């Protein structure tokens, strides 16, 4: 086999590979003879079909099957010999004739080689959130609202009321698509409608009609409406007032708590603290990764981005329960491209840093992280034992420990400031970020 490096520019490289004719023809001949012994053909007894007849009828097909098997073997050997770190490959067949060398080009995308410097340029705003009894009481109040019962009342609309409404949305005086609905239930203050909509209903009475003006958010999914000033003609058809359950032993049993109200309140606070810790870690880590992407200079292999896009599509299909009749591949790649590119770049950067630094996940550190994570489950010890039996899960935990160490290492060199934030705003932002990332 002869290998010629045709061109190597940045992360792109082409290998011209030539396989001697006798090697190809020998394998093809053996395959034809093997086929002749098993194939059934009219006029011949089984195993007695002449090889020449097989070659005449199936020779081209057999040759292509042989080549399809041989090409990956040959380019894999060439890549190994040339010591290339390949991210993606496309094969272009050049010459394929009996009695002549097989020639093909392997167009390669390589993993970029780069060093990350300038960590001091990274700016991170570290959120500081104080979790007090006030936030715990508010969380319990939110849980009470989830179990609220509603009864119709004759009064003006107030916060936390459930109202049944009709509305017609208009932009520049014309009704827009998706902006009209009838008999829609809205809980005032829930945030289920765009900002300003629910506030505009407060003070209205049953049977009252009113036109309100609201501006759609900048990041609204329908770009034709993003930042657009619109009007909504609203009719209130029913007003219902919420009746919240008392926080007693019967109420806390709905959440699987057996120790009474005090135990319930303690568990709520612990859950809030645990969730807050992970969210704040994620917020800081996201800023660190964003900063790393900004200072690192390299070309991102498109094949890796495409691979990540395909994985994101399959993950979406899985989240939808493998929806029958839905072809996820019909979704355009650009819906997933930005997130996919970020993931690939972040992964390449972290790998580059870890190659130059010695971050290790000690067994005690993995155990500590596992202990912390399983507290979110109903049966922590049982869950812990199940995870410890799963090699893949343990590998993921080790990777997370190393990732956390790397993040702390970058933070020691970055410009870090602190910003006080509200607990519920942080939770809301986290939910929005998760939804935006599919």
From Swiss-Prot:
Enzyme class label: isomerase
InterPro entries xrefs: PPIase_dom_sf, PPIase_FKBP_dom, Trig_fac, Trigger_fac_C, Trigger_fac_C_sf, Trigger_fac_ribosome-bd_bac, Trigger_fac_ribosome-bd_sf, Trigger_fact/SurA_dom_sf
Localization terms from the record: Cytoplasm
Keyword Chaperone found: yes
Keywords in alphabetical order: Cell cycle, Cell division, Chaperone, Cytoplasm, Isomerase, Rotamase
Role, per record: Involved in protein export. Acts as a chaperone by maintaining the newly synthesized protein in an open conformation. Functions as a peptidyl-prolyl cis-trans isomerase.
PANTHER family named among the record's database cross-references: TRIGGER FACTOR CHAPERONE AND PEPTIDYL-PROLYL CIS/TRANS ISOMERASE, TRIGGER FACTOR-LIKE PROTEIN TIG, CHLOROPLASTIC
Domain notes: Consists of 3 domains; the N-terminus binds the ribosome, the middle domain has PPIase activity, while the C-terminus has intrinsic chaperone activity on its own.
Protein name: Trigger factor
Gene source species: Francisella tularensis subsp. tularensis (strain WY96-3418)
